[in-house]
């Protein structure tokens, strides 16, 4: 059974293996043992902290095969994007250039560097083993975070954002970076992403142009790549769009990938999930798949189960499922249909 749980210090070697296979652009999952160790330690401190409002906390989860102990995925939530440093994005805007004497009235698409999204909660670090990308476990790895948020709303902001990795070709060339960022740094896209993952995106962002960029002046390839999704990030994009996220007015400052945005209370898994009592018995012989969590904090667990459940009734769990979730008879779980 695959179980989602908080990452632990002992997970570091396997987490680094996952990071090494993650696509370029996932700067929140650097292939660097020291940074990953810091990430896990910060997460452990966040799970242990008493929190009444969102602050500097970050929560890092792993997806584990309970039989073998192998990690096959990971994901994270940052409680407040840009808590310790500005969270930069490019904002899509329209400038109007007009001349009454020439009867000209042109609307021009521009990009403005901003940190409007600072303070929102941020979904990051999504990775799932390639053979699981099209499976229900990709849903568990992504949406399990949302059920954690549903159980602990005081720890998160009223809005959630996620930066989706933008388009780059098989050689790692990003048309958007080549047209914009590379003019300000003597770095190719892969080098820039690695550097930002090992250090900070902020110091690079602060060297980006602070005046609006006129989109029509960019090469066609760069314009066409704006808002486009990297093939390996498509599953993340699709899952979150089904959750009610929208492509807002922002794109990533490095690769031009879309930034998704949603009101926390309107996210499907949060709005439609239910807390129900547990009855332990035989596993149902038929049913539909549900994401199920124990709603706990440091001992948080989430799994996918086929359940025959009706609203207003207890949910029947097998002994194996109850043990995986760490719940007993009469306890409660939070669930939502896949």
Curated annotation (Swiss-Prot):
UniProt record similarity statement: Belongs to the succinylarginine dihydrolase family.
Keywords of this entry: Acyltransferase, Arginine metabolism, Transferase
Molecular function as annotated in GO: arginine N-succinyltransferase activity; N-succinylarginine dihydrolase activity
Enzyme Commission number: 2.3.1.109
Pfam families named among the record's database cross-references: AstA
GO biological process, one term: arginine catabolic process
Full protein name: Arginine N-succinyltransferase subunit alpha
Protein role: Catalyzes the transfer of succinyl-CoA to arginine to produce N(2)-succinylarginine. Also acts on L-ornithine.
Substrates-to-products reaction catalysed: succinyl-CoA + L-arginine = N(2)-succinyl-L-arginine + CoA + H(+)
Subunit structure: Heterotetramer of two alpha and two beta subunits.
Keyword Cytoplasm appears in the UniProt entry: no
EC main group: transferase
Matching Gene3D superfamilies: 2.40.40.20
Pathway(s) this gene product operates in, as recorded in its UniProt entry: Amino-acid degradation; L-arginine degradation via AST pathway; L-glutamate and succinate from L-arginine: step 1/5
């Amino acid at each position: 059974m695959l179980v989602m749980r908080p990452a632990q210090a002992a997970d570091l070697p396997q987490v680094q293996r996952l990071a090494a296979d993650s696509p370029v652009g996932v700067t929140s999952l650097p292939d660097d043992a020291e940074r990953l160790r810091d990430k896990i330690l910060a997460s452990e401190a966040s799970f242990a902290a008493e929190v009444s409002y969102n602050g500097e906390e970050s929560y890092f989860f792993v997806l584990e095969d309970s039989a073998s102990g192998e990690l096959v995925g990971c994901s994270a939530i940052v409680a407040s994007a840009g808590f310790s440093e500005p969270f930069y994005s490019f904002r899509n805007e329209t400038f109007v250039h007009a001349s009454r004497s020439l009867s000209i009235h042109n609307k021009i698409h521009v990009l403005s560097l901003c940190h409007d999204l600072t303070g929102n909660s941020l979904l990051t670090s999504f990775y799932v083993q390639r053979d699981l990308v099209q499976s229900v476990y990709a849903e568990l790895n992504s949406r399990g975070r949302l059920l954690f948020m549903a159980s602990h709303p005081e720890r998160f902001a009223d809005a959630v954002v996620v930066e989706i990795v933008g388009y780059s070709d098989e050689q790692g060339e990003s048309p958007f970076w080549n047209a914009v960022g590379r003019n300000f740094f003597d770095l190719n896209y892969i080098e820039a992403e690695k550097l930002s993952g090992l250090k900070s995106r902020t110091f690079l962002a602060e060297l980006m142009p602070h005046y609006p960029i006129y989109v029509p002046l960019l090469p066609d390839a760069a314009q066409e790549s704006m808002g486009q999704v990297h093939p390996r990030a498509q599953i993340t994009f699709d899952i979150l769009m089904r959750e009610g996220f929208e492509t807002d007015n922002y794109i990533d400052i490095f690769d031009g990938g879309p930034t998704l945005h949603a009101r926390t209370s309107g996210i499907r898994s949060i709005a439609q999930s239910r807390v129900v009592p547990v009855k332990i018995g035989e596993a149902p012989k038929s049913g539909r798949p549900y994401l199920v969590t124990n709603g706990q904090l440091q001992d948080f667990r989430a799994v996918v189960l086929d359940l025959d459940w009706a609203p207003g009734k207890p949910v029947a769990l097998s002994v194996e499922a109850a043990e995986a979730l760490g719940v007993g008879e009469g306890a409660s779980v939070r669930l939502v249909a896949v």
